[in-house]
Amino acid sequence: MSTYAAYTTSTYQGRGLASGTYASGFGQLVSGMSSAGAICTTQIRDAREREKREIGLLNDRLADYIEKVRFLEAQNRCLSHDIDILRNGFSGGGHVSGLFDAEINQAKHILEQTTAHRSTFERDITGLSAEIEVFRKKWLDAVNAVKAHREDHDVDLDRLAKIEAEISLFKRKIRIVEEDVIRIRRENDGIYNEIARIKQLTHNEIALKNERSLNVSDLLQRINLLQTENNVRIEQELVFIRRDTTADNRDYFRHELQAAIRDIRADYEAISIRNRQDIEVWYREQIRKIQDESVRVNPDLYKEELISIRTTVTNVRSRLAEVEGRNFFLERLIDDLKNNEEAKFFEISLAERDAQIATLRDQCTELSIQMEKLCDNEISLRAEIERYRILLNGANVTTYTSNTHGSGSGIAVGGVVGGSTRVISQTTRTHSSSNTSYSNVPASRGGYSISGNVGGISVGGTIGSHGASAHATGGIIGSGVQAHRGSVSSLITDKPRDRVHDEKGVDQSGRHFHSWYLGTISINQVTPSYIELKNICKIRRVDVGGFRIEQSVNGQVLGSAQINVPLILDPQEVVRFNHRHGKYLGQFFMDVDAFDNSTVARTSMYNYTEPHEERAWFVYLD
């Protein structure tokens, strides 16, 4: 018993150590779990520790019971030995044997109780082991779920890291662009200041030029005035000269003119002599002053003054050259500014024309789209009007009355049960097909059958030996259908049929493909990540709500997806179907791990109005 107790105690201690190891290892896993998972893990760990403590207490109680049993067995052996001694020492029975028997019975009762408690404890241990296994399975499921979520979490973290990297890159680019904008603004401010300074200088030069122009105009006016006065005087003198045409008058005029010339020459010579004398006197006076100053002034000072005068002259010349160069530069700058202004005005006018052209093009596109919509609405309205006209004429309402008597009217319906009369009212919708036949159509009760064609119209059937006849209340149905068939079919055929496109080409990766489609919606591209549909029309918007994409490999369907919401594609717009791992990237996805773009794969497109007619397909040739 002691060996079993030691083995049991060591076993449960080992299990407690293992559970502690699991708990510590699981505690390390808690750091990467969510709050709910961490709470659940903590509760499981507390329950395991509580169970471990209870198992330890039960082991201690079992060991105590075993020790008590061993002690009682030892006492039993001692008492048995004493009983044997007493029995051998005394003859016959006495009261001592009764006492010993009572003690033995009491010890047996205690032993039985201990054995009964042991079985109870073993059952408790078995139940706790089952619960431990259940909790262990739950724990393993939780660990697997955590690992699966951790993989998704890693994928999300990678995507988040890429997005954050792109955001940081865009922010850095924005900062660089902002710095460039600030630098360009500073340069623009400097250029504007330089332009303002040049404009001010230009304004000053223009003002000076205007002033000089005014002075020149004044001088020209004075010259013109003097010239006019002189011309008037000459004209007056010429008048007198023309009057005096005699030789004496000419001689007199000549002598007077010569005398006047001599007087003018004498006056000029006198003035010249007087001016020359005055200049000579002034020159001599200046020479005398210079000589006197040269005697008084130091030659070094004279040299310095001469150098300063030369320097001043040089500076004046350099300034004059600088002014001339600046004037030339300003003239060139004015010409450049004029050219730039003209070019800017031309670009502005050209941009306005382009904007007007783009606006007109958009308006034309919108008008074309509206016109197409109006045409479609007109066609549908015509069809509806014709349909309502047919309904009003009563050409599609037929009432059948069945009885036990037969009458040949070209229309026969089988169906008499027990001599009763049935009235069948049937409404048929007119289609574009010329003859529509219905045969072997089961009725609502077993044994009834209707056969015939709508165009004739003959419907017949039998039940046992009873016959039936029917009468059409709307007149001759065949003629009514024939009368309106042409107009309805003409309205339906007026709608243009979808154009068939059969294209072969090379995609961006260099692979050859073969694409076939009806209308304007095509399968533009198939990659392992997505399938792309495109509206190839440049002016028309198309509704793709209800379109279904299906991909098959060697005739076996790999997967399918449908657009279950109204969706209108603008001209040249695309829509993509992603796989299940990329369902967060778009609105539509297919429940596949990846799309097959090999040569054995075929991608097809269907419309909800014609679910079995293939509207488009796409395959790779290599």
From Swiss-Prot:
**Residue ranges of region Tail?**
400-550
Q: Where is this region: Coil 2?
A: 256-399
Give the UniProt subcellular location, in the record's own words: Cytoplasm
Q: Where are the stretches annotated Head?
A: 19-54
Segment Coil 1A: which positions? 55-86
Q: What is the lineage of its organism?
A: Eukaryota, Metazoa, Ecdysozoa, Nematoda, Chromadorea
**Record's GO cellular component terms:** cell junction; cytoplasm; desmosome; intermediate filament; nuclear envelope; nuclear lamina
| Gene Ontology BP, a term | post-embryonic digestive tract morphogenesis
- Can you name this protein? Intermediate filament protein ifc-2
Q: Where is this region: Coil 1B?
A: 100-237
The alphabetized UniProt keywords are: Coiled coil, Cytoplasm, Intermediate filament
UniProt similarity note: Belongs to the intermediate filament family.
Q: Which gene encodes it?
A: ifc-2
